[in-house]
Swiss-Prot record:
Keywords, ordered alphabetically: DNA-binding, Repressor, Transcription, Transcription regulation
Organism of derivation: Yersinia enterocolitica serotype O:8 / biotype 1B (strain NCTC 13174 / 8081)
Name of the protein in question: HTH-type transcriptional regulator HdfR
Ranges of the DNA-binding region feature: 18-37
A GO MF term: DNA-binding transcription factor activity
InterPro entries linked to this entry: LTTR (IPR050176), LysR_subst-bd (IPR005119), Tscrpt_reg_HTH_HdfR (IPR020890), Tscrpt_reg_HTH_LysR (IPR000847), WH-like_DNA-bd_sf (IPR036388), WH_DNA-bd_sf (IPR036390)
Family (UniProt): Belongs to the LysR transcriptional regulatory family.
Top-level lineage group: Bacteria
Record domain HTH lysR-type: where: 1-58
HAMAP family hit by this protein: HTH_type_HdfR (MF_01233)
One Pfam family here: HTH_1
Biological function: Negatively regulates the transcription of the flagellar master operon flhDC by binding to the upstream region of the operon.
Length: 293
């Protein structure tokens, strides 16, 4: 349905006069009458009764009125949102919560310091959801530890980052019992499972060698850090956080897990130039690979 017809209907119902409605809409009176007839033909019902200068809504017109108001309000909101997106969003970037919190937020801060007019949309979601958005052209750039294997996607290795097993209290060394067996292994501490990718969980299981269920499973690195003291647990967190959060205690017996960091976008994306320009800005605390033009 043509929204201009609904707009004309609402103006006539408000003014109860075709001439005044025409003035408000900057139309001729005949154009207003023609639009109303078009709308009536589409609906198969008369919307106004006309007795000289006395114009009233018919029962059909009364029923249409609230729907017309809602439709026009929704249409105006839709136009506003589309215009806002065109004016204020240059590029949409997606990543998991843990990557945003640990590495990408400082990178974003650097980008805005370098480009005052930069307009971005930062999305936080699970990797599977972001890959789908990228494939459907709803997302411009994906930052992930595992690039999707799709022919239409281009990927670039940005570098690597290191994760260490942290707790908020010192890890206890294994103690020996009278028969010589060890107990109180550090791996027996409550464990918080943080999402760092499917490949990570394989390394995680191999290093911890523990079958205990995690006390918490989450995608948020900051939530994990804040709950270490409460739970008395441990978790794999960014190695550089040891300097930022002195309360974190590293388990020196567990080696670091090194993860790759990739940028992924559509090969035929019209944002490729901007994407490559932004990726030249180093991601602090993640070793950088060379990014060429």
């Amino acid at each position: 349905m043509d929204t201009e017809l609904l707009k004309t209907f609402l103006e006539v119902s408000r003014t109860r006069h075709f001439g005044r409605a025409a003035e408000s809409l900057y139309l001729t009176q005949s154009a207003v009458s023609f639009r109303i007839r078009q709308l009536e033909n589409q609906l198969g019902a008369n919307l106004f009764t006309r007795h000289r200068n006395n114009i009233r809504l018919t029962p059909a017109g009364e029923r249409l009125l609230p729907y017309a108001e809602t439709l026009m309000s929704t249409w105006q909101l839709a136009k506003k949102e589309v215009a806002h997106s065109l004016q204020h969003t240059e590029l949409s970037i997606g990543a998991t919560a843990s990557l945003w919190e640990a590495y990408l937020t400082p990178w974003l801060q650097q980008l805005y310091k370098q480009r005052e007019t930069l307009r971005l949309e930062a999305r936080i979601a699970l990797r599977q959801s972001l890959v789908k958005q990228l494939h459907e052209r709803q997302l411009d750039l994906l930052i992930t530890t595992e690039p999707p294997k799709m022919d239409e996607l281009a990927s670039l290795l940005l570098g690597h980052f290191s994760l260490r097993l942290f707790s908020s209290i010192p890890f206890e060394l294994p103690e020996k019992t009278d028969d010589g067996t060890e107990h109180k292994n550090a791996n027996e501490a409550p464990y918080i499972k943080l999402e760092w990718g499917a490949d990570f969980h394989q390394q995680e299981s191999r290093l911890l060698n523990s079958e205990q269920m995690p006390v918490l499973t989450t995608t948020s690195a900051h939530l994990t850090r804040q709950l270490l003291d409460t739970t008395g647990g441990c978790a794999f967190l960014p190695e550089h956080w040891q300097k930022e959060y002195p309360e974190l205690v590293v388990n020196a017996d567990i080696p670091p897990i090194v993860r790759p960091l990739y940028a992924v976008w559509l090969q035929n994306s019209d944002q490729q130039t901007l994407i490559r320009q932004l990726l030249k800005t180093p991601m602090n605390n993640a070793a950088q690979s060379a990014i060429r033009d």
